[in-house]
């Protein structure tokens, strides 16, 4: 407990000290020893001749008792002797380092902290480096040990070794093999040079590896591009009917244009068009492809469908952008619908035996169907599949009834050409939306929604 200089502190026993003739009122007005011990110099040994505390004390009439005598009996009981280390006023001051400050014990001029690496410190580091020429990478424990010995910081030691390795490498005296950075050296600030050295020395080896990796990645990209937009020739017929619904679906537009370009002539010759991969029809679509098509392009689609059959249970396993294009542009959404509508489509079975119209219902029901409000559950679509591959809810059952009515009402249109198919698709949009449209979402937002996982 310290008091400012000039503060008159009178303990209860100080009233009896007025009888002391040698120390009158000047003794009581003098600064106390606690102020002397905790003076602004920050040192415990401030009341020496020449110090500010000593001169302030001498000015008040204490020049005679402050001689270098070992007898402190001339001091009152409430004043601790500046030479007595066991006085109450000195204990707090002696707890600090005599050369450091109490507020910040590690100042720049503190001998415990070394700004520059001295000759003896570098000699220790050089000796360690000479002994470990084949592996000049000290571990974390060795760095701490060297930092304690040389009185340097851990960053200084790391930087010194990094500079030494760079210097030896520049002088072609490198006798060690570059190695990877160990885990205990990740947080060192001076290891940036080491990483640069290792990267430059491993450049040739990494070039070969990166070339191989690049070839693999190019191969994967080519496969992905083939699956996304196989041979996009630019036939924009089927996508015109839904351009107002999908402004941002450029990828799906390219994919769908390509498929419709190849399947435009097959629509008049072959009974079934090739089905692309889709999480909804990943099981039955390859069967149709094997029965009807034999071209190499369709065999590639069959392989894609086989790959997607496993993901029909978990379509979230491939959360890519082209998955949306695959779903939005699949030709045959529901190949088992022919069994559901066998009586209604028997007259047109020669034209479309498995599905009435791929461009009519396969695409636009995905965007304009009223049960799309539950678009996070693919079970809504799978209510149409007779084998029940995926789980569906009661909402899908009610939506299935409305979809069957729509398919029955539009099945008579499927004998026409592609021009009449486009007209029928517009009629389906106008017929289907006002009846039981419950979705509160804008259909233009559908294209931006990726593949959603099952709840």
UniProtKB/Swiss-Prot annotation:
SUPFAM superfamilies registered for this protein in UniProt: Homeodomain-like (SSF46689)
Induction (record text): By a combination of a neural inducing signal (nog/noggin) and a posteriorizing signal (retinoic acid). Inhibited in the neural plate by foxd5.
GO molecular function: DNA-binding transcription factor activity, RNA polymerase II-specific; RNA polymerase II cis-regulatory region sequence-specific DNA binding
Positions with biased composition (Basic and acidic residues): 192-205, 247-256
GO biological process: brain development; cell development; dorsal/ventral pattern formation; negative regulation of neuron differentiation; neural plate development; neuron differentiation; positive regulation of DNA-templated transcription; positive regulation of neuron differentiation
Record-annotated DNA-binding residue ranges: 110-172
InterPro entries according to UniProt: HD, Homeobox_CS, Homeodomain-like_sf, Iroquois_homeo, KN_HD
Cellular component, GO, one term: nucleus
Subcellular compartments: Nucleus
Region Disordered, annotated ranges: 172-214, 247-319, 418-455
Bias-annotated ranges (Acidic residues): 257-267
SMART domains recorded: HOX, IRO
Function text: Acts partially redundantly with other irx members in neural patterning. Required for formation of the posterior forebrain, midbrain, hindbrain, and to a lesser extent, spinal cord. Acts early in neural plate development to induce expression of some but not all proneural genes, and specify a neural precursor state. Also up-regulates repressors that prevent neuronal differentiation. Patterns the neuroectoderm in both the anterior/posterior and dorsal/ventral axes. Probably dispensable for pronephric kidney development.
Entry similarity comment: Belongs to the TALE/IRO homeobox family.
Protein name: Iroquois-class homeodomain protein irx-2
Organism this protein belongs to: Xenopus laevis (African clawed frog)
């Amino acid at each position: 407990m310290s008091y400012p200089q000039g503060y008159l502190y009178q303990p209860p026993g100080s009233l009896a000290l007025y009888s002391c003739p040698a120390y009158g009122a000047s003794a009581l007005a003098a600064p106390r020893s606690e102020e002397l011990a905790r003076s602004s110099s920050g040192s415990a040994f401030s009341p020496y001749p020449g110090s500010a505390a000593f001169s302030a004390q001498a000015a008040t009439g204490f020049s005679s008792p402050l001689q270098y005598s070992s007898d402190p009996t001339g001091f009152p009981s409430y004043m601790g002797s500046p030479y007595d280390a066991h006085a109450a006023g000195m204990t707090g001051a002696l707890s600090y380092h005599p050369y450091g400050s109490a507020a910040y014990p590690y100042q720049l001029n503190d001998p415990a902290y070394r700004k520059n690496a001295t000759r003896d410190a570098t000699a220790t580091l050089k000796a360690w480096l000479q002994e470990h020429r084949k592996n000049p990478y000290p571990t974390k424990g060795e760095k701490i040990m060297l930092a304690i010995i040389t009185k340097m910081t851990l960053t200084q030691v790391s930087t010194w070794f990094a500079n030494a390795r760079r210097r030896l490498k520049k002088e072609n005296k490198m006798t060690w093999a570059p190695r990877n950075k160990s885990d205990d050296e990740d947080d060192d600030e001076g290891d940036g040079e080491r990483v640069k050295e290792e990267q430059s020395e491993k450049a040739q080896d990494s070039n070969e590896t990166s070339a191989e990796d690049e070839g693999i990645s190019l191969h994967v990209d080519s496969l992905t591009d083939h699956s996304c937009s196989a041979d996009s020739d630019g036939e924009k017929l089927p996508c015109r009917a839904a351009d107002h619904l999908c402004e941002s679906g450029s990828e799906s537009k390219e994919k769908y244009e390509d498929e419709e370009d190849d399947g435009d002539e097959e629509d008049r010759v072959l009974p079934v068009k090739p089905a692309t991969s889709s999480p909804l029809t990943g099981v039955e679509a390859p069967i149709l492809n094997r029965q009807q098509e034999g071209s190499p392009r369709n065999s590639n689609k069959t392989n894609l469908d086989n790959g997607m059959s496993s993901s029909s249970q978990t379509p979230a396993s491939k959360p890519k952008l082209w998955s949306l294009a695959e779903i939005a542009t699949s030709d045959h959404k529901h190949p088992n619908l022919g069994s559901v509508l066998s009586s209604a489509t028997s007259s047109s079975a020669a034209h479309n035996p498995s599905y009435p119209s791929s461009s009519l219902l396969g695409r636009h029901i995905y965007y304009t169907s009223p049960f799309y409000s539950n678009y996070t559950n693919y079970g809504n679509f799978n209510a149409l599949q007779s084998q029940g591959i995926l789980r569906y809810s009661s909402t899908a059952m009610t939506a299935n009834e409305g979809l069957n009515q729509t398919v029955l009402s539009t099945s008579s249109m499927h004998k026409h050409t592609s021009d009449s198919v486009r007209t029928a698709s517009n009629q389906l949009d106008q017929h289907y939306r006002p009846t039981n449209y419950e979705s509160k979402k804008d259909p233009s937002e559908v294209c931006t929604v990726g593949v959603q996982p099952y709840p």
